């Protein structure tokens, strides 16, 4: 009986050992966008002065970026920069960053995605209607690519009375902008 128990114990021990090499975890790849205004780092709700002397305060900055990749290697289909909610963070993804010494993307929602049914995108996609919310106009015009809102002082003087609201909602396929980033240094 002891012999059977010993054999079963040794058998269990040898089969429980994992001889496969542990999988190397992929690095967390993170893309940040840092907006600037007139060469200054952009901060929401700060007051800036235009070249003409007008004071302006931005209260909303949102924009879509799509089709991140490098040649035929796709990285990320779509991301929404919501500067008030997430700051400069555009997206994080577990990926081998060495595949991306350069990166291309589209500022806006690429025409291959812009006119699709927004409810058909996966729930976690920023293009899904429940996530896009007011950033989607409708099926014919598609998504708002960039939403910039704020307040401005219409009298160029020493006052900082930013009391006139403005809103720019930019979209439609005409305003797509291709982006290319070369010689990327991914920080550790």
Predicted regions and their residues:
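Positively charged n-region of N-terminal signal peptides that target proteins for export
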Residues: 1-4, 18-19
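A short, solvent-exposed, low-complexity linear motif enriched for acidic/polar residues
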Residues: 18-188
């Amino acid at each position: 009986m002891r012999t059977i128990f010993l054999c079963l114990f040794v058998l269990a021990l040898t089969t429980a050992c994992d001889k496969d090499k542990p999988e190397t975890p992929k690095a967390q790849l993170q893309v940040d966008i840092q907006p600037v205004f007139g060469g200054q780092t952009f901060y929401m709700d700060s007051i800036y002065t235009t070249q003409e002397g007008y004071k302006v305060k931005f209260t909303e900055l949102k924009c879509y970026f799509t089709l991140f990749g490098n040649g035929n290697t796709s990285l990320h289909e779509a991301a929404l920069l919501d500067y008030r909610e997430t700051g400069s963070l555009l997206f994080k993804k577990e990926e081998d960053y060495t595949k991306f010494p350069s990166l291309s993307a589209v500022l806006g929602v690429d025409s291959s995605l812009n006119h699709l049914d927004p409810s058909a995108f996966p729930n976690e996609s920023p293009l899904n209607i429940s996530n896009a919310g007011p950033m989607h106009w409708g099926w014919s015009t598609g998504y708002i690519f960039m939403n910039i809102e704020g307040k401005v002082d219409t009298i160029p003087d020493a006052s900082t009375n930013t009391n006139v609201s403005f809103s720019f909602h930019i979209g439609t396929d005409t305003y797509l902008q291709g982006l290319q980033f070369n010689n990327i240094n991914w920080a550790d």
